[in-house]
Amino acid sequence: MEPATALLIVDYYDYTSPDPPFLETPSHLSYTSVFLPIFYTVVFLTGVVGNFILMIALHFKRGNRRLIDIFIINLAASDFIFLVTVPLWMDKEASLGLWRTGSFLCKGSSYVISVNMHCSVFLLTCMSMDRYLAIMHPALAKRLRRRSSAYAVCAVVWIISCVLGLPTLLSRELTHIEGKPYCAEKKPTSLKLMWGLVALITTFFVPLLSIVTCYCCITRRLCAHYQQSGKHNKKLKKSIKIVIIAVAAFTVSWVPFNTFKLLAIVSGFQPEGLFHSEALQLAMNVTGPLAFASSCVNPLIYYVFDSYIRRAIVRCLCPCLKTHNFGSSTETSDSHLTKALSNFIHAEDFIRRRKRSVSL
């Protein structure tokens, strides 16, 4: 069965490539040619500056660096590379969908975006699993959490992401319609739609499920520790807040667009389509910018809610300031939680063994 020919697409960034006739409505023209270029400009400037400062601050930070900072630096690099391509798409939206920068950048920018989107999702998953080990299994984490392991995992993530982005080089092309150039996707086939469906599930929904599962377990353990200790531990409360905000930001950024993307792919398998193609395309055009915005949000989240990163950024921007101005403690929230929860877990094990011995 030949898939339906529609406006719908199967890559993260393809919401920027609807057919030209669909754009020729006044309301949609004002959205794509006025709002989106302004929005992308803000995302580009704040994201490039924020991620660059974050990378520099953590890379050149004095003293010992946290293990999770390796993932954060790679995530910032992934977002930074992604944001470098945003001006190309800004120009596209401002020119009413025309692609004026040639075939090489059409394929190349699409490939870069695809690679870094996969990389970002996988790195977020690795970060959640790293926090899960550090907080839920402190003893096991001491054996597994090594800098060499973190570097190796990041290298594997980049390699896999580069491989997963290769189909983009084959599917994207510079198409001329009525003499006007458009960076668009080739006509979808059943095989391509099937690949898009499998890729979407394995590179987004499965990682999202693992992220939510890890953070739910972490939050449950933190709440149990908080109730057991009976003290108002500000670091524990702040850690729970960071977890909730990180999950919420990731979910709000990606779930809406990828949900409509999933519906678009499923609809493409049907001759007439299960859903109205223009309605789905409009929904993806509206929710798509949220995915772009996610690349500039992470530095802000880390700066506001992670005092360790905040101190590193301030010291990077103002090296003349002394350490004691930001507190003399060098203990990170992860190390604090690991020690506290390790004692909590050992206490739980002791109570269980004691109950077992009494019952015997």
UniProtKB/Swiss-Prot annotation:
It is found in: Cell membrane. Phosphorylation is necessary for YWHAE binding and efficient surface expression. O-glycosylated. Sialylated O-glycans in the N-terminal tail inhibits binding of GPR15LG. Residues 55-69, 142-149, 214-239, 306-360 are cytoplasmic. GO terms for molecular function: coreceptor activity; G protein-coupled receptor activity; virus receptor activity. Keywords: Cell membrane, G-protein coupled receptor, Membrane, Phosphoprotein, Receptor, Transducer, Transmembrane, Transmembrane helix. InterPro entries: CCR1-9-like (IPR050119), GPCR_Rhodpsn (IPR000276), GPCR_Rhodpsn_7TM (IPR017452). Disruption phenotype: GPR15-deficient mice are prone to develop more severe large intestine inflammation, which can be rescued by the transfer of GPR15-sufficient regulatory T-cells. In addition, dendritic epidermal T-cells from mutant mice remain low at birth but reach near normal levels in adult skin. One of its GO terms (cellular component) is plasma membrane. The modification Phosphoserine is found at S359. Residues 1-33, 91-120, 171-192, 261-284 are extracellular. Gene3D superfamilies: Rhodopsin 7-helix transmembrane proteins. It is a multi-pass membrane protein. The chain crosses the membrane at residues 34-54, 70-90, 121-141, 150-170, 193-213, 240-260, 285-305. Signal peptide: none annotated. Highly expressed in gut tissues and lymphoid organs, largely restricted to TCRbeta+ cells. Expressed in fetal thymic dendritic epidermal T-cell precursors. GO terms for biological process: angiogenesis; G protein-coupled receptor signaling pathway; T cell migration. Pfam families: 7tm_1 (PF00001). Interacts with adapter YWHAE; this interaction promotes ER-to-Golgi transport of GPR15. G protein-coupled receptor that plays an important role in immune homeostasis. Acts via its natural ligand GPR15LG, a chemokine-like polypeptide strongly expressed in gastrointestinal tissues. GPR15-GPR15LG signaling axis regulates intestinal homeostasis and inflammation through the migration of immune cells. Controls thereby the specific homing of T-cells, particularly FOXP3+ regulatory T-cells (Tregs), to the large intestine lamina propria. Also required for skin localization of thymus-derived dendritic epidermal T-cells. Belongs to the G-protein coupled receptor 1 family. This is G-protein coupled receptor 15. It comes from Mus musculus.
